[in-house]
Design a protein with these regions (language model features):
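Intrinsically disordered, low-complexity linker/loop segments enriched in Gly/Pro
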Residues: 17-82
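Short intrinsically disordered terminal tails
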Residues: 1-3, 39, 207
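C-terminal functional regions that serve as terminal interaction/effector modules
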Residues: 75-79, 83-207
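Short amphipathic alpha-helical heptad-repeat segments
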Residues: 1-17
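Residues that form generic nucleotide/phosphate-binding pockets
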Residues: 15, 50-51, 133, 172
């Protein structure tokens, strides 16, 4: 439901309350509460941020793959698998944001899951510090080029000597994950992220 429709419903609810039409007012109140919860959910996390932008050669990565208890999205730089209970009819399918089905084969994302996490060192990420660094990048960009920009591909965040794209790292942090696991000996391997709801990976930037 669009925000304009929600605003109209709110006005109707206020009118019905004044007219003491409590039954209808309560019904509209429930609709507004449900829509508010849905909007909060959508604001919290959007898995389609992780899909590949339009690419005629890799259309299978432009949707979300439903695989058992996970739904998975990747753009080949970062990957996120969200745990939950998903509709049975979507199992094994790749679904675009508009609900249409993509005909294609999704990569074997489970092959990225390390069999042994021992070589991976945890790094706690300070989201506020990352946000401050990104804001500094934006100010520097504006000072140099005379115009502001939301993102630039050259912006990097250094974590224990390993570089990551600022944009992709920030998207990973949108899941609420705050710890990055980096392989101690092979730092160009994908770094691993996980919590109770998500499992994911992000590729470092090759120097």
């Amino acid at each position: 439901m669009k925000q304009s429709s929600i605003d109209k419903l709110s006005r109707v609810y206020n009118f019905l309350e004044k007219e003491e039409q409590s039954g209808m007012a309560e019904l509209i109140k429930e609709v507004l509460r449900a829509e508010s919860q849905q909007m909060n959910c959508n604001t919290k996390f959007d898995i389609y941020k992780f899909v590949l932008p339009k690419d005629k050669y890799r259309t299978q990565l432009q949707g979300v793959f439903y695989d058992g208890e996970y739904r998975v999205a990747t753009d080949q730089i970062k990957l996120i698998a969200q745990k939950g209970e998903w509709p049975e009819e979507l199992q094994g399918k790749i679904v675009k944001s508009d609900g249409s089905i993509i005909d294609g084969h999704f990569p074997n994302w489970r092959s990225l899951i390390p069999k042994d996490m021992t070589p991976y060192k945890p790094h706690k990420i300070d989201k506020a510090a990352v946000a401050a660094k990104i804001e500094a990048f934006r100010l520097e960009h504006k000072a140099e080029y005379g115009k502001s920009t939301q993102w630039c591909d050259e912006w990097r965040i250094d974590i224990d000597g390993v570089l990551f794209s600022a944009k992709h790292l920030w998207t990973i942090l949108s899941t609420g994950i705050d710890t990055l696991y980096i392989h101690e000996r092979e730092q160009y391997r994908a770094a691993i992220v996980s919590n109770d709801e998500f499992w994911g990976a992000i590729m470092p930037v090759v120097k």
